[in-house]
Amino acid sequence: MLIIFLFFNFCYGFNEPLNVVSHLNHDWFLFGDSRSDCNHINNLKIKNYGYLDIHPSLCNNGKISSSAGDSIFKSYHFTRFYNYTGEGDQIIFYEGVNFSPHHRFKCFFNGSNDVWIFNKVRFYRALYSNMALFRYLTFVDILYNFSFSIKANICNSNILSLNNPIFISTNYSKDVYFTLSGCSLYLVPLCLFKSNFSQYYYNMDTGFAYGYSNFVSSDLDCTYISLKSGSYKIFSTGFVLSIPTKALCFNKSKQFVPVQVVDSRWNNLRASDTSLSDACQLPYCYFRNSSGNYVGKYDINHGDNGFTSILSGLLYNVSCISYYGSFLYDNFTSIWPRFSFGNCPTSAYIKLNCFYDPLPIILQGILLFLALLFIVFLLFLVYHG
């Protein structure tokens, strides 16, 4: 029995990395959209769990923050808002598709959606890298020393209306300050229109300035700055002040744990982008994707088998999570678990050549049988003189 076990273990491998998102224990959390929004099922004409890419048994575990039609990026910048909030040691993201080239958003008629896709990459890169160091995520409003009775109505379309940042004239008579308080770290937007000017956030406590210059953008070009609690003054060399109104709040620092990101894309009939894979980089992020087109069972954009398989890893714990995938066991494997965390395999074996062409084996058996018959015939002749 031991020989049979070793044969199959070495020849077939019982501990290959799985293309799933998973967790080491029950201390995990998922941020998503309609494909993991269990509450949205009740709004369908027929209550059909085939709409989801997650298993229905995950719906009531309190470890999912998802909203149909939303994304963290969309909620961050626009009036269409869902307060994504959650906490866990191992964080999984499966959202982002609800702001894509399919929506063709741009601030002006002659603006550029490409600029907004670049903004999306920068945003998620900052989100993923920060979330590898913190347990808790939510949205907060940014407080100011006065109310904005006069503001420019800029950057609206028939799809979305921008409200983070907003804009006021630099001729406004008062200095503009904002205060960040209560979170360990904030992700704040700093956005500029095409022009030869710059803008800064100046920390009144430390004297440190966070700046951004804009020379080439054909739309609203944004960078995303991680700020600590404090009082900040905004000043600009342009004609308008870009005023942030919302920030992502990171709290409860943790030991570094890479986030896991599942690609969020449409069926090929709609335009998607590669923002999430561009943003999800080592060492702070593992990216999981399906090899095929997204083809849903409920409709073409909901209930794909490939992504359902990737999300099925949330149903069980694994021993190790790495760049190559998740490992069920911590014994050994044929693929070394690079950039890993958890109880990971400590050795990689060489897979033996256990598969043969059956035809040569059959011929060898026939020849061996004939050789045995010949030997028996010779022994018979010798025995009988």
UniProtKB/Swiss-Prot annotation:
Belongs to the influenza type C/coronaviruses hemagglutinin-esterase family. The keyword Glycoprotein applies. Pfam families: Hema_esterase, Hema_HEFG. Isolate N5 belongs to genotype C. Genotype C probably arose from recombination between genotypes A and B. Its main location: virion. It comes from Human coronavirus HKU1 (isolate N5). GO terms for molecular function: host cell surface receptor binding; sialate 4-O-acetylesterase activity; sialate 9-O-acetylesterase activity; sialate O-acetylesterase activity. Residues 240-352 are annotated as: Esterase domain 2. Structural protein that makes short spikes at the surface of the virus. Contains receptor binding and receptor-destroying activities. Mediates de-O-acetylation of N-acetyl-4-O-acetylneuraminic acid, which is probably the receptor determinant recognized by the virus on the surface of erythrocytes and susceptible cells. This receptor-destroying activity is important for virus release as it probably helps preventing self-aggregation and ensures the efficient spread of the progeny virus from cell to cell. Glycans are attached at N83, N110, N145, N171, N196, N251, N289, N331. This is Hemagglutinin-esterase. It catalyses: N-acetyl-9-O-acetylneuraminate + H2O = N-acetylneuraminate + acetate + H(+); N-acetyl-4-O-acetylneuraminate + H2O = N-acetylneuraminate + acetate + H(+). One of its GO terms (cellular component) is virion membrane. InterPro entries: Capsid_hemagglutn, HEMA, Hemagglutn-estrase_core, Hemagglutn-estrase_hemagglutn. HAMAP family: BETA_CORONA_HE. Residues 1-11 form the signal peptide. Disulfide bonds join C38-C59, C107-C155, C183-C249, C191-C222, C280-C285, C320-C344. N-glycosylated in the host RER. It is a single-pass type I membrane protein. One of its GO terms (biological process) is fusion of virus membrane with host plasma membrane. Its EC number is 3.1.1.53. Homodimer; disulfide-linked. Forms a complex with the M protein in the pre-Golgi. Associates then with S-M complex to form a ternary complex S-M-HE.
